[in-house]
């Protein structure tokens, strides 16, 4: 090692000419069992420094195994111990003696850059590596793996209280999100109307785009995070290696400084001894010259002889001295080279520290950016949750609207069917109405013809035959004995059914089956055409009834009743005839009062049709012969009823005044 070589050189320079130990090397000060008193305090100081360095190295290793929080605490402790270490270094530098190596040691401990390089050789390197930002300045342009390697440790040291990382979005979450978005589009397009579907589709597209952008950003952040973690691991490994190298170099510098101090002390002691020996020799020579002034040439000659006698040993010593001087010169050159190398190493260390400081600043900036991105990520997570809730609400609304639209479509279809039925019915009713109008006009013409024919028949003399055929369309009443009964019964039943059941009226008048008219009682209110048809039919019925019920337009029935029947009726016993006639009159009056009441109710309900339509099987089954026969029978019955009523009032109706056919018809009509 370098201290041993320096010790050997100094020992060779202190040997005397006749010393037998000249060929041996002087022992090093650290190997001596009893050091000098002046060197003991310094040895204690160096031992303390070495112990502090060892403890700091062990502390660094233990902190490297633990987390970032103990490292930060150790950094704070190191920062707290910094002033005392610096003052101790300055005291050591001031207490050193003024020799040739003192400026070099001062350069080693203090350096050419002021207080930034302090702490070398005193165990402060670990503190510098723990907290580099407190010891260095700034240097721009640093990049590469060194910049990214120190990020994670600085993040742990600068931000120990960061919140735990948010749960990462995995590929399964992305698939679920895309599946939900794919499920939303078809029901929305099928269920909602066109405008709402477009609006919701735009909303869903925006939500899908937002989700995809969030997924992309999350994947990019995950990749960056993995890269930063890899760089941080490499940076930690490099930091551990550099710390180990720095500790080794710190120990070497400490040993070198201690050996230099010991060599300087030994050289000073040897110089003092040589000066004392030279003074003693000079004093001895002076004493000899003073005591024997005449013997001086002899002594000189003796000394010359002695020098001549010891010449080979002297030459060997001189050669050895020359070799030692050359070796010392080489060692000096090596020392200067080592100094330059140490200066370069010091500059490199300072550059590394500056790079680490810049990396720490960049890490702080990156940590701020990371915090902002985490906040943005949390906001995006909240936005995604809110959008998911909105999507669920929209799904529920879409389902509700779909059910409502289905109901409305069903109602619309039913309404369309009803509307089509009503349109068909209105068309059919219009055609029926037109037919009825034509038939009514025909019946009116025929009625006028019949009235004219009846007038002509009235003007003709009565015929003695018993037939009632005064016109070509009439039928004798004797040939139809039960016609009046059936006619009255049919009139009553038809009127009652028309009043009670309008469906029966429609079946009888418009030839509709029972299944087709089941829904008519509910559809009357929706058709204005039907109301108009009803009103028109009621007016026609009233007009027909008025035309039929006019007494002056009808032909009296006396002309059609033969005299033989009137004469035969007088043969009935008087008492029985009177009782029967009274009963018949009372029953018939009651029956016609009921019929008139029913007719009044029917007119109020706008359901009564013409008497011609009600008397038969409907307008489709009417025949002209049948209608004329009904009119004749109606006139005959009415005239007979009037005649009988007049005869009862006058008391002129004897026993058997009415024929048997008329009595049976009256009874059946009353029943």
Curated annotation (Swiss-Prot):
<keyword id="KW-0967">Endosome</keyword>
<feature type="coiled-coil region">
    <location>
        <begin position="212"/>
        <end position="427"/>
    </location>
</feature>
<dbReference type="GO" id="GO:0048011">
    <property type="term" value="P:neurotrophin TRK receptor signaling pathway"/>
</dbReference>
<keyword id="KW-0175">Coiled coil</keyword>
<dbReference type="GO" id="GO:1904115">
    <property type="term" value="C:axon cytoplasm"/>
</dbReference>
<dbReference type="GO" id="GO:0031410">
    <property type="term" value="C:cytoplasmic vesicle"/>
</dbReference>
<dbReference type="GO" id="GO:0005102">
    <property type="term" value="F:signaling receptor binding"/>
</dbReference>
<keyword id="KW-0072">Autophagy</keyword>
<dbReference type="GO" id="GO:0008089">
    <property type="term" value="P:anterograde axonal transport"/>
</dbReference>
<keyword id="KW-0963">Cytoplasm</keyword>
<comment type="function">
    <text>Originally identified as neuronal protein that specifically associates with HTT/huntingtin and the binding is enhanced by an expanded polyglutamine repeat within HTT possibly affecting HAP1 interaction properties. Both HTT and HAP1 are involved in intracellular trafficking and HAP1 is proposed to link HTT to motor proteins and/or transport cargos. Seems to play a role in vesicular transport within neurons and axons such as from early endosomes to late endocytic compartments and to promote neurite outgrowth.</text>
</comment>
<dbReference type="GO" id="GO:0007268">
    <property type="term" value="P:chemical synaptic transmission"/>
</dbReference>
<dbReference type="GO" id="GO:0030426">
    <property type="term" value="C:growth cone"/>
</dbReference>
<dbReference type="GO" id="GO:0005783">
    <property type="term" value="C:endoplasmic reticulum"/>
</dbReference>
<keyword id="KW-0968">Cytoplasmic vesicle</keyword>
<dbReference type="GO" id="GO:1902430">
    <property type="term" value="P:negative regulation of amyloid-beta formation"/>
</dbReference>
<dbReference type="GO" id="GO:0016234">
    <property type="term" value="C:inclusion body"/>
</dbReference>
<dbReference type="GO" id="GO:0045742">
    <property type="term" value="P:positive regulation of epidermal growth factor receptor signaling pathway"/>
</dbReference>
<feature type="compositionally biased region" description="Low complexity">
    <location>
        <begin position="20"/>
        <end position="29"/>
    </location>
</feature>
<dbReference type="GO" id="GO:0005829">
    <property type="term" value="C:cytosol"/>
</dbReference>
<dbReference type="GO" id="GO:0005730">
    <property type="term" value="C:nucleolus"/>
</dbReference>
<dbReference type="GO" id="GO:0006605">
    <property type="term" value="P:protein targeting"/>
</dbReference>
<dbReference type="GO" id="GO:0048311">
    <property type="term" value="P:mitochondrion distribution"/>
</dbReference>
<dbReference type="GO" id="GO:0005776">
    <property type="term" value="C:autophagosome"/>
</dbReference>
<keyword id="KW-0970">Cilium biogenesis/degradation</keyword>
<dbReference type="GO" id="GO:0048403">
    <property type="term" value="F:brain-derived neurotrophic factor binding"/>
</dbReference>
<dbReference type="GO" id="GO:1902857">
    <property type="term" value="P:positive regulation of non-motile cilium assembly"/>
</dbReference>
<dbReference type="GO" id="GO:0005856">
    <property type="term" value="C:cytoskeleton"/>
</dbReference>
<comment type="subunit">
    <text>Self-associates. Interacts with HTT/huntingtin; enhanced by an expanded polyglutamine repeat within HTT. Interacts with DCTN1; decreased in presence of HTT with expanded polyglutamine repeat. Interacts with KLC2. Interacts with ITPR1 and APP. Interacts with AR; decreased by an expanded polyglutamine repeat within AR. Interacts with YWHAZ. Interacts with BDNF and SORT1; probably forming a complex involved in proBDNF trafficking, degradation and processing. Interacts with TBP, AHI1, HGS and KALRN.</text>
</comment>
<dbReference type="InterPro" id="IPR006933">
    <property type="entry name" value="HAP1_N"/>
</dbReference>
<dbReference type="GO" id="GO:0008021">
    <property type="term" value="C:synaptic vesicle"/>
</dbReference>
<feature type="compositionally biased region" description="Acidic residues">
    <location>
        <begin position="258"/>
        <end position="288"/>
    </location>
</feature>
<dbReference type="GO" id="GO:0021549">
    <property type="term" value="P:cerebellum development"/>
</dbReference>
<keyword id="KW-0206">Cytoskeleton</keyword>
<feature type="domain" description="HAP1 N-terminal">
    <location>
        <begin position="106"/>
        <end position="461"/>
    </location>
</feature>
<dbReference type="GO" id="GO:0030425">
    <property type="term" value="C:dendrite"/>
</dbReference>
<keyword id="KW-0268">Exocytosis</keyword>
<keyword id="KW-0539">Nucleus</keyword>
<dbReference type="GO" id="GO:0031587">
    <property type="term" value="P:positive regulation of inositol 1,4,5-trisphosphate-sensitive calcium-release channel activity"/>
</dbReference>
<dbReference type="GO" id="GO:0007420">
    <property type="term" value="P:brain development"/>
</dbReference>
<keyword id="KW-0813">Transport</keyword>
<dbReference type="GO" id="GO:0047496">
    <property type="term" value="P:vesicle transport along microtubule"/>
</dbReference>
